[in-house]
Amino acid sequence: MRAIRTVAVNVFLESVRDRVLYNLVLFAVILIASSYLLGQLTAGQDVKIIKDLGLSAISVFGLFIAIFIGIGLVSKEVERRSIYALLSKPVSRSQFVTGKYIGLVLTLAVNVAVMVAALYLVLGYLSWRETAAFKLSWDAPGPDPRLMKAVFLTFLELMLVTALAVFFSTFSTPMLSAVLTFGLYLAGQFNADLKNFDKVVDSQVAVWLSRAAYHVLPDFSSFDVKTQVVHGLPVSPGYLASTAAYGLAYIVALVLAGTFIFSRRDFK
């Protein structure tokens, strides 16, 4: 565990020094703050627009961080030949990959926390500025604690994207890892549609392939509850628990697969 912790801390410290990371987070915070101005253009819908744009900004910029830092976590060490020095230390390859993943998850957690704080500050200001009579027209309060349900699932989604990026980086180039990770992310957004593919095609082979893809591809759409939260609709604890269990199981499988592949690579 000490070796994993050391690798994770090094990844975290290296990531927070990355200027690209600061630029992404700064741009996300500016976008969240700007949503207040956009909300003023739509009477009665301002709080919904701020919540929707804020949660979307957290998801999109978190995705950029997960992919563009995650794809180079392992391959960068191989390209710089620093992998030899790292593996000569008392660190196994499985500890190396696991530590890299945990380090990036810590980086994501800090940056998501910053963006969430910015969103709640904007919502808090809006709630303070508006009259009590006007706030009665809102479906949910401004700084609504239930927003954290959407943030929780969004963070799990980003953890899964990170696991994909780290998995691909154990055996492919950064460019290919980015393409594969982003491609699977997009495909996973439409995973639920594959379940009913037999209703739109007649080919039995296509139906079998779609069902296989449905069970293999990660269902990223299940992590998206922004619409329900923004409109004050309930998201049950059971749904949160089952989705979290699904995401964590997929993450563990990807990290284990990545460590298995990386442990068998020959760097000579």
Pin down the residues of each PLM region.
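Aromatic- and glycine-rich beta-strand/loop motifs that create alpha-glucan
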Residues: 1-22
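Helix-capping/transition residues at the boundaries of transmembrane alpha-helices
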Residues: 14, 75, 86-88, 165, ...
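Hydrophobic alpha-helical transmembrane segments of multi-pass membrane transport/permease proteins
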Residues: 19-40, 56-67, 177-189
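Residue-level recognition of transmembrane alpha-helices
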Residues: 24-28, 100-101, 108-109, 181-182, ...
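Secretory targeting signals
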Residues: 32-73, 97-171, 197-199, 210-214, ...
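Alpha-helical transmembrane segments of multi-pass membrane transporters/translocases
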Residues: 36, 227-268
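Transmembrane helix boundary and interhelical loop/hinge segments in multi-pass membrane proteins
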Residues: 67-87, 91-93
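Helix-loop interface residues and adjacent transmembrane-helix termini in multi-pass membrane transporters
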Residues: 77, 90, 171-172, 264
